[in-house]
From Swiss-Prot:
Residue ranges occupied by any WAP domain in the UniProt entry: 27-74, 75-121
Disulfide cross-links: C34-C62, C41-C66, C49-C61, C55-C70, C81-C109, C88-C113, C96-C108, C102-C117
GO cellular component labels: extracellular region
Function according to Swiss-Prot or TrEMBL: Putative acid-stable proteinase inhibitor.
Main location: secreted
Name by which UniProt lists this protein: WAP four-disulfide core domain protein 5
Pfam families: WAP
Species, as recorded: Otolemur garnettii (Small-eared galago)
Subcellular location as annotated: Secreted
Coiled-coil zones: none
PANTHER family xref list: WAP FOUR-DISULFIDE CORE DOMAIN PROTEIN 8
Signal peptide (residue range): 1-24
Keywords attached to this entry: Disulfide bond, Protease inhibitor, Repeat, Secreted, Serine protease inhibitor, Signal
GO molecular function: serine-type endopeptidase inhibitor activity
């Protein structure tokens, strides 16, 4: 009887391990996000990676101006940045560079004139 229970437990655990991750990440995608890239494409070079699995431990495969590259990941807060419907008349400097620069739940979001800390919208 005890062997039967152990076998049932093993089968259940094996099945659960095959379920997709609840986090919504794609298979092989590492946690965290990519830092923003503001640079223009100065030199077109081949992609250095196609996905996170090709990057060392804490690095992610991130899009740059005109190619993909393994770079250190940054922490990303929950929610999405709101869409900015405005047009910029006078560009300003960025008020943040990544989510960790923003207080509380605010995210560092692109706006018409630069990056700024904004309240996220629910996904």
């Amino acid at each position: 009887m005890r062997f039967g229970r152990l076998l049932l437990l093993a089968v259940l655990l094996a099945g659960v391990s095959q379920l997709p991750a609840v986090s919504g990440r794609k298979k092989g995608e590492k946690p965290g996000g990519c830092p923003p890239d503001d640079g223009p494409c100065l030199l077109s070079v081949p992609d250095q990676c196609t996905d996170d699995s090709q990057c060392p431990s804490t690095m992610k495969c991130c899009p740059r101006a005109c190619f993909r590259q393994c770079i250190p990941r940054v922490s990303v807060k929950l929610g999405s940045c709101p869409v900015d419907q405005l047009h910029c008349l006078s560009p300003t400097k960025h008020l943040c560079h990544q989510d960790s620069n923003c207080s509380g739940k605010k995210r560092c979001c692109p706006t018409a004139c630069g990056r700024d800390c904004r309240d996220p919208v629910k996904e």
